[in-house]
A protein has these predicted regions:
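Hydrophobic h-region of N-terminal signal peptides that target proteins for export
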Residues: 6-17
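A short, surface-exposed beta-strand/turn
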Residues: 211-217, 333-347
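Positively charged n-region of N-terminal signal peptides that target proteins for export
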Residues: 1-4
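Extended beta-strand-rich segments in extracellular/periplasmic secretory proteins, especially
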Residues: 160-200, 261-336, 346
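Non-transmembrane domains of secretory- and envelope-associated proteins
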Residues: 19-116, 236, 247-283, 287-307, ...
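Short, surface-exposed coil-to-beta transition loops
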Residues: 205-208, 225-226, 329-334, 346, ...
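Solvent-exposed N-terminal domain segments of exported/luminal and surface proteins
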Residues: 20-226, 233
């Protein structure tokens, strides 16, 4: 069951999001300029542009020999034209309902940035998290992944490798789905399906997981349906249905819960949300160096938890806090830094029931249009296509999470999940989609 718990968490986490531009953006004054290199001797320059909790635990992340490259300030990554059009078409339609639920949502960004008043609107926090939840993410996700467990620089034996796919079933913005109101199939009740296939280690090889999340999860708690999850275990040669209701339980052998991945992968109405403010931060946003599955030469630092030898950018971020409505939740609260342009997660900080800092979670990202050379080029090349367009989306224009790192600051242990080839193009036909999300696929063990 320990293996299944870890793998189930990964199934929910892995590829498992466009923003309005201000008419005249005024860039903040910072000590950084594009092309600068920051070494360990210079890290004090970063202090005012990092979350204080991150700076106080910087020994996990900054190290002798690091070479941090400064990228552009507040680059506008945008989104696909189709997502931007859906945002404009449905502007003003989405509303908040009971329990902070999302009502009347059809597609695109639910709440335009210019309508969010962090200081004056008590609902600003929940609006931000819905924008995060519904941000542009292509047609889902597809990746090869690696999961490793670390203890202050020592890689522990627990590890997994495999592939995963997220299939978005509702709220599509491509024109071909307009007749079904954005759904792939008529009368669809699911938001999406999430699958994972384990390839290593040998004793876990062949495990398959499939999870459904339902549209009702966006609604009031009294109407919400929990995720359904099935797992195929080769040793048992049968499919088991497992409970996914306890998403907040710590996964055995790890330092995170299922809802920790991507900083937050839970169900928003199960939490109270606050907007704590806005901050200009520097963060690893658009990697210039590849890692798993392309190579094992990425420098994660002496603790195995660092992106310091990569490209970082100055970004404007929302800071939101969730407070669990469930008194049995392991967290007192969590603070999440969310990029205001892309709604990608930057940093988050989870506090235990004693209100003491417990975990730091941060991420790296990769932008589709910076790797847009010839389709037949090696995707490992700097101009090699790894994320092509598809019908209705010629250019994905998608900044995607390609790695999650979770650090338990109380023990020095942590987890690293790498999926650098994460991309959001869909399966080529509805038939292939049906086959992938069919529970019967698990019975066949493939």
């Amino acid at each position: 069951m320990r293996k299944l718990a870890c793998i189930f968490a990964l199934a929910l986490a892995l590829p498992a999001r466009a923003a309005e531009q201000k008419p005249q953006d005024v860039l903040p004054t910072t000590p950084f300029k594009e092309g600068d290199t920051i070494s360990y001797a210079d890290v004090d320059k970063l202090k005012d542009y990092l979350p204080p909790q991150f700076w106080e635990n910087r020994e996990f992340f900054f190290y002798e020999g690091m070479q941090l490259t400064v990228g552009p300030t507040e680059r506008k990554y945008g989104t696909s034209d189709a997502y931007a059009a859906a945002t404009e078409k449905h502007k003003g339609e989405a509303k908040l309902g009971e329990d902070g639920s999302l009502q009347n949502y059809q597609g695109g960004r639910p709440f335009p940035n210019e309508t969010i008043d962090c200081k004056g609107d008590p609902n600003a926090g929940v609006k931000i998290i819905w924008n995060f939840n519904k941000a542009w993410n292509g047609s889902g996700g597809n990746a090869a992944w690696s999961y490793t467990y670390w203890d202050r620089g020592e890689q522990l034996p627990l590890y997994y490798e495999g592939t995963s796919r997220t299939v978005q079933l509702a709220h599509h913005v491509e024109p071909q789905y307009a007749e079904n109101d954005g759904d792939i199939f008529p009368n669809e009740k699911r938001l999406g399906a999430f699958g994972i296939e384990v390839e290593a280690p040998f004793d876990a090889r062949g495990i398959l997981v499939l999870t459904y999340r339902y549209k009702s999860a966006d609604g009031a708690l009294k109407e919400a349906k929990n995720d359904d999850t099935w797992v195929f275990v080769p040793d048992l040669r049968r499919v088991r249905r497992i409970s996914s209701a306890q998403r907040t339980d710590s996964v055995q052998g790890t330092d995170f819960t299922m809802d920790d991945l991507r900083s937050f992968s839970g169900i928003p109405p199960q939490y109270k949300w606050q907007c704590l403010g806005e901050k200009t931060v520097i963060a690893p946003v658009n990697t210039k160096t590849l890692a798993y599955p392309y190579t094992d030469t990425y420098n994660f630092g002496p603790y195995g938890f660092s992106y310091a030898s990569d490209r970082w950018e100055v970004r404007d971020a929302w800071i939101v806090r969730f407070i669990p409505k469930n008194e049995d939740h392991p967290y007192h609260h969590k603070d999440i830094y969310i990029d205001k342009d892309t709604y990608e997660p930057l940093y988050s900080f989870a506090y235990d029931r004693k209100n003491e800092l417990w975990k730091i979670i941060w991420h790296n990202h990769r932008y589709s249009e910076d790797w847009n050379g010839k389709v037949n080029k090696d995707p490992k090349a700097a101009d090699g296509v790894w994320y092509p367009g598809w019908e209705g989306v010629d250019q994905p224009k998608n900044l995607r999470t390609v790695s999650d790192i979770i650090v338990n600051v109380q023990t020095g242990t942590g987890n690293r999940i790498e999926f650098w080839n994460n991309e959001g193009s869909p399966l080529s036909t509805k038939g292939k989609i049906r086959a992938y999300i069919d529970i019967g696929r698990l019975n066949k063990g493939r």
